[in-house]
Amino acid sequence: MPTNNTPFLTIFLLFLGLLRFDSFPGLEAATGKLASIPGLYVFGDSLVDAGNNNYLPISISKANYPHNGVDFPNKKPTGRFCNGKNAADAIAEKFGLPLPPPYLSLRGLLKREKRKSAAVTGVNFASGGAGIFNSSDQKLGQAIPLSKQVNNWLSIHEEVMKLEPSAAQLHLSKSLFTVVIGSNDLFDYFGSFKLRRQSNPQQYTQLMADKLKEQLKRIHDSGARRFLIIGVAQIGCTPGKRAKNSTLHECDEGANMWCSLYNEALVKMLQQLKQELQGSITYTYFDNYKSLHDIISNPARYGFADVTSACCGNGELNADLPCLPLAKLCSDRTKHLFWDRYGHPTEAAARTIVDLMLTDDTHYSSPITLTQLVST
């Protein structure tokens, strides 16, 4: 049912779609003259989960307890697998948007107005433990796989479509849809003899790319046009993997090889998808594998002193146990690349990675940079 707020929101969206942040004095240096985006919608796993798993009663993949959130405003553990804000938050801040709230926090009659507002500026659908395949949530008890995250987006999409049609279309075409997923599917493959018997690494990673393609099409069909797709990082270099890999604490290159295979399949899939959709989709693929490799190879260049151990944990490389309330906490989180044994980045690392996304060259981004993407 239309409300009295509809005309205002229509004008507001049209305004956002045409506005550039460099129109505001003093914001130029902070944003690097970024073009504005009206909304940020986030899909993925624990790398960008803002607290959706807090609302899943039987999920064991949660971060709503200390030391998580030790550097978040008010030192609040929000459900982010991080000491502070994650990469999705950093992207929102770069574009001057509010932090996208977790989708599950917007349910219920008392949250109706908050839901309407979030539908305009962005929502976070990501879930710790989620994967591209629907089966990825079985190991951790409960998560929201990508297909269900897209279902949740479609319910938010209904709120957007209550606006005047041209404003809704403009909003969808100018917003940024960010996807960060795939690591848990690979972890499942490493740990499952059944999966390895059913398919070789090339077949499995190609199937991952094919299934992701199906979900990207669903989002595109709803009116989305701009996508930021983030590849899988070197999960063989997480503190947990290093701690198990001999006394030298080297990366697990076998695991890294599978990450490379998936990223190669992902890049080819995105190229094919653009052709199939006759150019109606515009995307930036960010090579997170390469960015993490460069940070680990030259940590001082990026401001880090420790790129092997976890900031929060216990034991060898602080990676024998998860980040629990009684875990050992590093004193300077700004110097650590990894927050915990699973390889979640610290807030400092997340911000560094987002800065690399926003560089003007294509060393990490293809076929265009993120700054070019939001200017199209």
Swiss-Prot record:
PROSITE patterns: LIPASE_GDSL_SER (PS01098). GO terms for biological process: lipid catabolic process. It is an enzyme of class 3 (hydrolase). One of its GO terms (molecular function) is lipase activity. Residues 1-29 form the signal peptide. Keywords: Glycoprotein, Hydrolase, Lipid degradation, Lipid metabolism, Secreted, Signal. Glycans are attached at residues 134, 245. The active site is at 46 (nucleophile), 340, 344. GO terms for cellular component: extracellular region; plastid. This is GDSL esterase/lipase At5g55050.
